From Swiss-Prot:
Superkingdom, natural source: Bacteria
Ranges for region Disordered: 1-41
Organism in which the protein naturally occurs: Rhizobium meliloti (Ensifer meliloti)
Protein name per its UniProtKB record: Uncharacterized protein in mosA 5'region
Similarity comment text for this entry: To the N-terminal of nitrogenase iron protein (NifH). Has lost the ATP-binding site.
The protein's role, per its UniProt record: This protein is either not expressed, expressed at low levels or rapidly degraded.
Length: 102
């Protein structure tokens, strides 16, 4: 009898946020592009609604605090974590060149 309770508690559905699928967006390009500024409050709120519908109501990804600390080199003398190396890939620090002192 313990197994059905575990399935109900740990299984899919029943706990946590409901999963909403992203809806197809029919808004204009200026409403769904990130670089265009809002014209007024109504335009701002319509943009926020469009962006929320594009992601299914979950918002956009925010990097974890561990990767931000690694980027700022808070751990002196320790090698950078793998996640930070992935984030640094393509930058001057990710190419193996020493950072430029400013």
């Amino acid at each position: 009898m313990a197994a059905p309770r575990q399935i109900a508690f740990y299984g899919k559905g029943g706990t946590g946020k409901p999963k909403r699928k992203p809806e197809p967006v029919t808004a204009s390009k200026e409403d769904r592009c990130l670089g265009s500024p809002s014209k007024n409050k109504a335009h701002f709120h319509s943009r926020m609604n469009v962006m929320a519908r594009m992601r299914g109501g979950h918002g956009f990804r925010v990097p974890s605090a561990a990767s931000r600390k690694a980027m700022k080199h808070k751990w002196k003398g320790q090698p950078l974590p793998k996640k930070a190396l992935i984030l640094l890939e393509g930058t001057k620090m990710g190419t193996g060149q020493p950072p430029v002192a400013s």
